[in-house]
Amino acid sequence: MSAEAHPLYRQLPAIDRLLNEPEMAPLLAEYGPVLLADTLRQLQAEAREYIGQFHTLADWCADWPAALRQRLNQRQPALKPVFNLTGTVLHTNLGRAPLAESAIAAVTDAMRSAVTLEYSLEGAGRGHRDRAVADLLCALTGAEDACIVNNNAAAVFLLLTVMAAGKQVVVSRGELVEIGGAFRIPDVMRQAGCELVEVGTTNRTHLKDYRQAINENTGLLMKVHTSNYSIEGFTAAVSEQQLAALGQECSIPTATDLGSGSLVDMTRYGLPAEPMPQQLIAAGVDLVTFSGDKLLGGPQAGIILGKKQWIERLQQHPLKRALRADKMTLAALDATLRLYQQPDRLVEQLPSLRLLTRPASEIAACAQRLLAPLIACYGTDFTLDIESCWSQIGSGSLPVDRLPSWALTFTPKDGRGSTLEALTARWRTLTKPVIGRVADGRLWLDLRCLEDEAALLRELAS
């Protein structure tokens, strides 16, 4: 630090003095003293750094209240709405499935008022928080009962803990999956107190492999749907119906983790087939787990369907209380499931399915409408084009299947990657940030998930 800079440090006002200035009164009333003091400390640290580097005061030091208000206006909430133009519909980092309007309304109502979360109107006493949603799930899938926890990882962990702690769990080697966040089935089994017994090989597993692994300490026969990868070629796998029959023969419960889980046949919408929970229940599987916020299109939740005797054991375990869903989740899940009672209106009412089934021709027309106004804004520095591309479903759902789509691409005229980086960085600071993807030296805006063209143009023109 140079000697010339020292007097300038003493010109920086004390925080207490600043907070007591009359000009600060409106800010104190709006934001409170804790946030103001914290923000002033940040500004003072930046002012010291500026003095140390340039040996002068920053311009904004002449008007601390104005500088403070500007900084407070720039503060962003922890969760901020964005334009998802990445091409991944169920983007884990961007919150997965958007909720239906009816689910949003149900959550809002649950937040505003006392609700019958664990209260029975029939008996005027304590009820069970999963009951209403469980009844709806059973009606939709044919399951005897259901259990709801806060996500599918929790569902798998609860199932393994209750059904097979201290026992062996038999799983095919080709199904020992890892999902996002290093969530590995073998690790989960270890934490649940289970002993993993691998059978078969990576690409081929037969019913006899399961049968040969069964002994007096076998607690569970398990299948895991490989929702985030695919093994093709010389393969063989045991069906849920075959494994369920073996379990019944040997008096050993069976379970399948579906991961995504869809309550409707996706092929009716032109999408690839995905196993449905009701198919597994009909095949005789004792317990089935899947997510609420993937193909189902609801809130984050872990759903366990199955035989009543096993679901009751899950509900009674102390771990269930630690993993239970709150009233907002249950309200959103209930409203989402009710949409499935009218399957012919599902595309119209369920946002995630609407985005997944959006025709490529409609997306191309959107790109044509946006091209000219965006060239007017960015054509000086970038070459803008309309390109065909492939969207993906995301969240580990149908990993090898792609959806035909269209994108706007931005190619920097100076050929520099830093120009693209500067553009994407600026778009991340917008009131509603725009998130695309960079590939092949271009920025791609896949328009599959864009439903408000005017709002996007307002942001990008700002």
From Swiss-Prot:
Pathway: Aminoacyl-tRNA biosynthesis; selenocysteinyl-tRNA(Sec) biosynthesis; selenocysteinyl-tRNA(Sec) from L-seryl-tRNA(Sec) (bacterial route): step 1/1
Record PANTHER family: L-SERYL-TRNA(SEC) SELENIUM TRANSFERASE
Listed cofactors: pyridoxal 5'-phosphate
Family: Belongs to the SelA family.
Subcellular location: Cytoplasm
Subunit structure of this chain's protein: Homodecamer; pentamer of dimers. Binds only one seryl-tRNA(Sec) per dimer.
GO biological process: conversion of seryl-tRNAsec to selenocys-tRNAsec; selenocysteine incorporation
Main function: Converts seryl-tRNA(Sec) to selenocysteinyl-tRNA(Sec) required for selenoprotein biosynthesis.
Taxonomic lineage from the root: Bacteria, Pseudomonadati, Pseudomonadota, Gammaproteobacteria, Enterobacterales
Catalytic activity from the UniProt record: L-seryl-tRNA(Sec) + selenophosphate + H(+) = L-selenocysteinyl-tRNA(Sec) + phosphate
A Pfam family that the UniProt record links to this protein: Se-cys_synth_N
EC number in record: 2.9.1.1
The keyword Nucleus belongs to this UniProt entry's keyword annotation: no
Keywords from the UniProt entry: Cytoplasm, Protein biosynthesis, Pyridoxal phosphate, Selenium, Transferase
Protein name: L-seryl-tRNA(Sec) selenium transferase
GO molecular function: L-seryl-tRNA(Sec) selenium transferase activity
Modified residues (N6-(pyridoxal phosphate)lysine): K294
InterPro entries linked: PyrdxlP-dep_Trfase, PyrdxlP-dep_Trfase_major, SelA-like, SelA_trans, SelA_trans_N_dom
Organism: Yersinia pestis bv. Antiqua (strain Angola)
Entry GO CC: cytoplasm
